[in-house]
Design a protein with these regions (language model features):
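A subset of signal/propeptide-processing and intrinsically disordered low-complexity segments
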Residues: 1-2, 47
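Bacterial N-terminal signal peptides that target proteins for export
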Residues: 2-12
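Bacterial N-terminal signal peptides
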Residues: 11-21
Length: 143
């Protein structure tokens, strides 16, 4: 029994030594992948539209002005501002079309061609577009 216990200890010690050598070898354990922050999606009946890197739809508010959001307080609860910096964009999108503004509530928000971008709180899954056309002022963003 004592020999079995010593063998288990030896195996554990060797395991720790080997894992320490592998981790300290300077070689990455997993390769880092740059996440795309913005991409183009397509949906039947909707066409092409912008989404975040996870496929969540992005919207624009027709009452906004270039580089100025008018969706504040309660509005921003239902339509959370989208923000990513830097805006890593998918091939086919122009990085220069995206910028960041500081809102009146001091939060930062990403813009597309000057128009602030938003999520819709009732979109729960990638590809949901439930906010499109709400109040005739909210629309998906088309590239």
């Amino acid at each position: 029994m004592r020999n079995t216990f010593n063998e288990i200890k030896l195996v554990l010690i060797l395991g720790f030594i080997i894992s320490g050598v592998l981790l300290s070898s300077g070689q990455p354990v997993a390769e880092a992948v740059e996440k795309v922050g913005l991409k183009v999606m397509a949906k039947e009946g909707v066409g092409k539209y912008l989404s975040d890197g996870d496929g969540m739809t992005l919207y624009r508010f027709s009452k906004d002005e270039i580089n100025k959001s008018h969706c504040i307080e309660g509005c921003a609860v239902n339509w959370p501002p989208f923000y990513i910096d830097p805006a890593a964009v998918e091939d086919g999108l122009e990085p220069s079309d995206f910028a960041v503004i500081t809102r009146s509530d001091s939060r930062q928000q990403t813009t597309y061609k000057g128009m602030p971008l938003y999520y819709f709180k009732n979109d729960k899954f990638p590809g949901d577009t439930f906010g499109d056309g709400i109040g005739d002022v909210w629309f998906i963003v088309t590239p």
